[in-house]
């Protein structure tokens, strides 16, 4: 058995068995890996898809447990096991009392609509393709002030609301939103109840990025986009209090923190 791997932040870890991991071994973190000539790779006994070049990807949710096991089968048929220990994160909690009930829970009249929309978004995030864009750096999609962070949560009248799973970038309506990495549009809708103008890009092997509260979409479903392409404009659509981009990162249905991977440079400057 190999030595346990720990990581507080961005890491490149390798061993004598040619295991290489890059990313963040922490709650909300995405990790890419590489093992030469591996026949199979598993995380906690669940198979991971492997690219022809031996790369794979996985991630850890907001409240994921801290101990995990990565295992792989070498070309000779033998299995290797690598324990992983991820770091626990503290999140911003905001408790607000005296809020009117209608703002705590949505009216019953919109439940059918919101369930249908949630199903469509879930299906888009379940997209699996063999693109390998996820191996490329993730650049900043828009200019503006960081107004909200991943993992934060509000309590209204003692009732916990869903945690925030994105990075909010506040700026005026019409501010360009650029593709932070190449991908394919798998979802584009101008008017979802909660998220308003919503766009989802597929980057391969279960990795997607989502763009919410958009004023205008400049791409459509099925369209290929390149790093730095203008894909949308910041807006205040859906249930929001002001114009901003809510930017999200997913590995399948696992919600991750895009801020951990975001390069400081604006995506449009990389074209």
Model feature map: region roles:
Residues 176-187, 219-234:
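Short, well-structured beta-strand-loop connectors
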Residues 180-218, 243, 248:
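Zn2+-dependent peptidoglycan hydrolase active-site motif and core
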């Amino acid at each position: 058995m190999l030595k346990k791997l720990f990581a507080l932040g961005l890491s490149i870890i390798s061993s004598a068995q040619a295991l290489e991991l890059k990313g963040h071994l922490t709650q909300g973190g995405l990790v890419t890996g590489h093992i030469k000539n591996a026949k199979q790779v598993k995380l906690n006994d669940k198979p991971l898809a492997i690219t022809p070049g031996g790369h794979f990807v996985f991630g850890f949710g907001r409240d994921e447990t801290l101990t995990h096991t990565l295992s792989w089968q070498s070309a000779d048929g033998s299995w290797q096991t690598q324990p992983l220990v991820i770091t626990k994160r503290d999140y911003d909690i905001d408790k607000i009392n005296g809020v009117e009930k209608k703002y705590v829970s949505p009216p019953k009249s919109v439940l059918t609509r919101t369930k249908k929309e949630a199903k469509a978004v879930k299906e888009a995030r379940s997209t699996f393709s063999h693109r390998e864009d996820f191996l490329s750096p993730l650049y900043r999609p828009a200019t503006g002030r960081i107004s909200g962070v991943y993992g934060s949560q509000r309590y209204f009248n003692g009732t916990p609301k869903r945690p925030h799973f994105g990075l909010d970038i506040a700026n005026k309506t019409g501010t360009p939103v650029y593709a932070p990495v190449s991908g394919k549009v798998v979802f584009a809708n101008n008017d979802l109840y909660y998220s308003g103008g919503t766009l989802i890009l597929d980057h391969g092997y279960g990795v997607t990025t989502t763009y919410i509260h958009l004023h205008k979409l400049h791409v459509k479903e099925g369209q290929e986009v390149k790093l730095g392409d203008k894909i949308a404009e910041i807006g205040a659509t859906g249930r929001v209090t002001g114009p901003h981009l809510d930017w999200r990162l997913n590995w399948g249905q696992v919600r991750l923190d895009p801020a951990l991977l975001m390069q400081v440079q604006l995506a449009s400057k990389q074209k």
